[in-house]
Amino acid sequence: IFKEKKWMNYSSKKAQILNVLSWSAKDWIDTYYFDESGFSLDSNIPYYWSPIGKPVEIPSNRFAKRINVLGFLNTKNNHLFSKTTITKVNTQVVIDFFNDFVNQITKTTVVILDNASIHTSKLFKAEIEKWEKLGLQLLFLPPYSPELNKIEILWKHMKYHYHKLEAYLSFDNLHKHVKNLLAGFGTNYDINFK
């Protein structure tokens, strides 16, 4: 249904997204936002309060291992379909995750995503027709518009609001913490996307 030129202007694309969201509000379709993000021991926390005389120190871990997260987020019901990996995220990893996702949809589903090269590669594009036959439609955002991808808000909250300092003490702690945040989203952790 979204066969028009990929590079619509910002306001036209935003109107198209609002139209899709109105269909979702009527339960005609499901709408999800897709993106990837990464977490490492190189802390995103800009400052931390500690008692006087007891400074909290986090060792610098430049070039630390990274936990990559892929996620589909439905902001209507806060359903999050996600996966973590410590491997590099490439087109094939994204395709495999899309295949997992499409196998669990129950009605026509629109996925809103950015134009990252792994989403626009020949390998990725070769899968689109198969996904469309299974009820999955892709709606690409205009360039440089992360504010239209609501899952970016979740990544921001995970990095800057929900993190506990103890998560940065070891890679295992961080991995467990990221998994707990993802598993607890919608129950223990909530965001009002409106």
Where are the regions a protein language model picked out?
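Short functional hotspots at interaction and active-site rims
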Residues: 1-194
